[in-house]
């Protein structure tokens, strides 16, 4: 992300469900009504992921709500959207995705300093159930430490 960015949506489950190994930024192909919906905050990327199809990267399962003023020119809320990346970046991603168990997860959607919509993607590997339990224990222990320190002073 650059100097200024306005985060519109975040995938908070991603850091809990996956080990994020690498992060990258990609542009996204949108229709006019989709852009207006994103500006109004009607977007969710909870279960969205990116995958390769015919040497291009597409974003699946992302939700961008309908824009009410667009009437008949409105878009489909859950459609497959093309991501804009350089050819070398796409080849690098395809190489990394060939590793077993790796996936490309959408981490956030934001406006960059030039007011363009960008998607932050994370190359992720799934966590096992015991990894998730360990993460929960760690979070609770940190909260408990903070409470103890607060009561000490």
UniProtKB/Swiss-Prot annotation:
Superkingdom of this entry's organism?
A: Bacteria
Q: Does the keyword Cytoplasm apply?
A: yes
Q: Where are the transmembrane segments?
A: none
Q: Name one Pfam family in it.
A: SmpB
Which molecular-function annotations from GO does this UniProt entry contain?
Answer: RNA binding
Q: What is its main location?
A: cytoplasm
Compartments, record wording? Cytoplasm
Keyword Cytoplasm listed: yes
Annotated Gene Ontology cellular components are: cytosol
Mind listing the UniProt keywords for this protein, alphabetically? Cytoplasm, RNA-binding
Cystine bridges: none
| Gene Ontology biological-process annotations | trans-translation
Q: What does this protein do?
A: Required for rescue of stalled ribosomes mediated by trans-translation. Binds to transfer-messenger RNA (tmRNA), required for stable association of tmRNA with ribosomes. tmRNA and SmpB together mimic tRNA shape, replacing the anticodon stem-loop with SmpB. tmRNA is encoded by the ssrA gene; the 2 termini fold to resemble tRNA(Ala) and it encodes a 'tag peptide', a short internal open reading frame. During trans-translation Ala-aminoacylated tmRNA acts like a tRNA, entering the A-site of stalled ribosomes, displacing the stalled mRNA.
Entry's NCBIfam families? Answer: PRK05422.1 (NF003843), smpB (TIGR00086)
Q: Which PANTHER family match?
A: SSRA-BINDING PROTEIN, TMRNA-BINDING COMPONENT OF TRANS-TRANSLATION TAGGING COMPLEX
Similarity annotation: Belongs to the SmpB family.
Indicate what this protein is called per its UniProt record.
SsrA-binding protein
The organism encoding this protein is: Orientia tsutsugamushi (strain Boryong)
**Which gene name does the record give?**
smpB
């Amino acid at each position: 992300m650059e100097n200024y960015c306005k985060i519109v949506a975040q995938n908070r489950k991603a850091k809990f469900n996956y080990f994020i190994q690498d992060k990258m930024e990609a542009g996204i192909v949108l229709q006019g009504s989709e852009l207006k919906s994103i500006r109004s905050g009607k977007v969710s990327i909870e279960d969205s992921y990116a995958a390769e199809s015919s040497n291009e990267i597409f974003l699946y399962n992302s939700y961008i709500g309908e824009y009410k003023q667009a009437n008949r020119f409105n878009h489909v809320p859950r459609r497959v959207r093309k991501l804009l990346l350089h050819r070398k970046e796409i080849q690098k991603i395809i190489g990394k995705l060939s590793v077993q168990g790796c996936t490309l997860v959408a981490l956030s959607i934001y406006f960059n300093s030039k007011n363009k919509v960008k998607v932050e993607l994370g190359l992720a590997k799934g966590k096992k159930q015991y990894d998730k339990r360990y993460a929960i224990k760690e979070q609770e222990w940190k909260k408990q430490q903070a409470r103890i320190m607060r009561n000490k002073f």
